[in-house]
Amino acid sequence: MSGHSKWSTIKCKKEKTDNARAKVFTKIGRELAVAIREGGPDPDNNSKLKDVIAKAKAANIPNDNIERAIKKAAGEDSSKEYIENVYEGYGPNGIAVIVETLTDNKNRTAGDVRHYFDKYGGNLGQSGCVSFMFERCGVILIDREDEDENVVDEDTLMEAALEAGAEDFLTEDDTVFEIRTAVPDLGAVRDSLEAAGYKFSTAEIQYVPSTYVKLTDEESLKNMAKMIEMFEDNDDVQNVWHNWENPEDAEDLI
């Protein structure tokens, strides 16, 4: 879940492997456990759980797997508590990086995060050092063609999204429509669009960069791609957000 929508080329390709799918399921399983601990196992009475379930469905996790994970999380020993932390820092050439973690061992995770920054030409910063470069908002992505290859009508979708409470409707990407919401409104907008028959490929809270930085030299491209890969391979890391403009240029280098 690195970067932001159209800048996530590397991640999207990596997630097609079975190993990456297993990683995604492990990470979402932790989010389910936290949501259930905080609000119980009924999604109708637990908006956070409902959001995580929607995220799991968008990641193509089968309903049976989601239900089993919920039952497992509801019956788990509550002594195993996951702690949410957000780390901020810089990648090569000043790329802004935000790392969201969910861990049962804060010291282990902090050490890993610092190591990845240091190893690949970046540095871990103080809280707030880069977050001002991002807007935290709800993001819903809907494919321009549905599962039956029918073209989704732009005007109809835009009207439905704005009526549901969306703040912005973006059409720059050739493959998806991007709908942005205020953080508290994500669930309501998503549910309204789902009720209208739309299927989404992403529906989550994201850090959206206000500006992007382009890398040009091969070493920086390699280091930035490898840094993101290491973060995403760590089970404690839930999301990595950055303002790297051209991750696709590193595809053939790693």
Positions of PLM-derived features:
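N-terminal cationic and glycine-rich segments that engage phosphates or anionic surfaces
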Residues: 1-143, 185, 242
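Positively charged, low-complexity, intrinsically disordered RNA-binding extensions
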Residues: 143-254
